[in-house]
A protein has these predicted regions:
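Short, well-ordered beta-strand elements
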Residues: 40-51, 68-73, 96-97, 146, ...
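Extracytoplasmic "Venus flytrap"/periplasmic binding protein-like
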Residues: 59-130, 147, 165-168, 265-266, ...
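C-terminal capping/gating helix-and-loop segments adjacent to ligand/active sites or protein-protein/ligand interfaces
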Residues: 368-424
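Extracytoplasmic/periplasmic solute-binding protein
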Residues: 144-151, 155, 165, 182-230, ...
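Extracytoplasmic/periplasmic substrate-recognition and gating elements
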Residues: 246-250, 287-348, 353, 409
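Hinge/lid segment of periplasmic solute-binding proteins
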Residues: 102-156, 184, 295-297, 363-364, ...
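Glycine-centered hinge/linker elements that transmit conformational signals in sensory
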Residues: 187-191, 227-257, 286
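Short, low-complexity disordered leader/linker segments with a strong preference
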Residues: 1-44, 423-429
Length: 429
């Protein structure tokens, strides 16, 4: 998971458009074959839900593979996964490589017949490259491997030192980490912050982000080990809701929808002091508010550990160049590529050798006050334990984000919104 954009993907998203595109492509292919003028250039389209930091790598790959032309399609997180599902259903319209976020990987790996089994293209020889649980997350029920892992989202808290200072709180990252061993302690710090905060500044950005971080530390959370939805019966999910609501009702939240334009503006204007911060969030903050360099630092996450996000590169079977697509995906997820992306964007590698390497452990991010981000996030990633994920993980996450927003916008009470959330979960799952 990484910088999310709202740019619509410039490709067909309806069945009619897909069928028209197929007809045009077939006619063009027939004409080029008949004339003998068909180009040897292979165009590979890569479908992403944000900036993965691949642009320099594309150029490098094209230089060493002169017959390959790479095009990138970017759209918002929910639209990307929704449209991918549609394209798979109709058998056309998918890109040669499609990214899938961990919240949706269970949904797509339940349809392995729609993806290339990467084991048949040699991926088995790469298995030890990844954390064991990361490799396993994209294994389909029939044993097929449908994706190559990109990053993992081990957690921390990114905070504005200048705003902490104005509120009379410590600014040193070690001292700040000690303020909140638990999420309840985090809310208590928020209460202190609000008493002395600069006008218009809130302690955290969005209740949904706090809730998601707490959920990321649970196992099980939304699903049990048998794949049953347990949202309503898991007391830890309700406890996560309750502690989040304390911050929301305590007016500690800016009440922003994550990845919205208002949220992006909040980074620029400094309207919130903390954000739950998976490793990939570093690149997002840098991209949204470059002029805040040096004002941010990174502390430990309350509760310790947890993983929020991380993605995979898949190869839909409907593509015309599946072998070439796999080769590109293999390059983009190679150790050298993932190490490069980490230093450029903060997306944490999902490969143990890299997580233990001096290149990662010794890396400090100047934007975040030279925080030892490799050490902070890398050490956490090595201790991560996979969470049980189900086919509607992403849908449930969307439903709870909407539920929290209803409370933040004073449309429903916490109790009524929770009950509505449970109804919504039942409807989608």
């Amino acid at each position: 998971m990484r910088t999310f954009l709202k740019t619509p993907r410039r490709r067909a998203t309806t069945l009619a458009a897909v069928l028209v595109a197929l007809a045009v492509a077939a006619a063009a292919f027939a004409a080029s074959t008949a004339s003998g003028s068909r180009s040897d250039t292979v165009t590979l389209r890569v479908g992403l839900f944000g900036d993965f930091g691949y642009h320099d790598l594309y150029a490098k790959y094209e230089k060493s593979h002169p017959n390959i032309d790479i095009k990138e399609d970017i759209e918002s997180y929910p639209d990307h996964h929704s449209n991918l599902a549609k394209h798979l259903a109709v058998g056309a319209g998918a890109d040669d490589i499609e990214s899938v976020e961990v919240g949706f990987i269970a949904q797509f790996k339940s349809q392995p017949n729609l993806f290339v089994n990467l084991k048949k293209l040699g991926a088995n020889s790469l298995q030890k490259q990844w954390l064991g649980w990361k490799w396993q997350q994209s294994i389909a029920p029939n044993g097929a491997q449908i994706g190559l892992g990109t990053d993992v989202g081990s957690l921390a808290i990114c905070y504005r030192k200048d705003l902490f200072k104005k509120a009379g709180l410590p600014t040193n990252r070690d001292a700040v980490s000690k303020l909140w061993p638990t999420w309840q302690a985090y809310m208590n710090v928020g209460k202190r912050f609000q008493k002395h905060a600069p006008k218009g500044v809130k302690f955290f950005d969005a209740g949904s982000n706090v809730f998601n971080a707490i959920i990321a530390q649970l196992n099980p959370a939304y699903y049990d080990s048998h794949g049953k939805v347990i949202v309503g019966s898991n007391p830890k999910v309700k406890a996560a809701w309750d502690v989040t609501m304390k911050g929301v009702q305590g007016k500690q939240t800016a009440g922003l929808a994550a990845f919205s334009n208002d949220w992006n503006t909040g980074y620029k204007k400094g309207t919130f002091a903390t954000v739950t911060c998976p490793a990939w969030m570093m690149g997002y903050i840098q991209g949204q508010a470059p002029k805040t360099k040096g004002k941010w630092d990174i502390a430990a996450v309350p509760g310790g550990g947890g993983n929020w996000g991380g993605s995979f590169l898949t190869v839909p079977k409907q593509g015309s160049h599946t072998k070439e697509a796999y080769d590109l995906a293999k390059f983009l997820t190679s150790p050298a590529s993932e190490a490069y992306i980490f230093k450029q964007t903060g997306n944490l590698p999902s490969q143990p050798k890299l997580l233990k390497s001096a290149a990662v452990l010794g890396f400090k991010n100047p934007f975040f006050s030279n925080a030892p981000v490799g050490k902070i996030f890398g050490a956490s990633a090595m201790k991560l334990k996979p969470q049980v994920l189900g086919p509607h993980q992403g849908d449930i996450q969307t439903a709870v984000s909407n539920a929290i927003q209803r409370v933040e916008q004073h449309k429903q009470s916490p109790d009524k919104s929770w009950k509505q959330f449970l109804k919504d979960v039942k409807a989608v799952s």
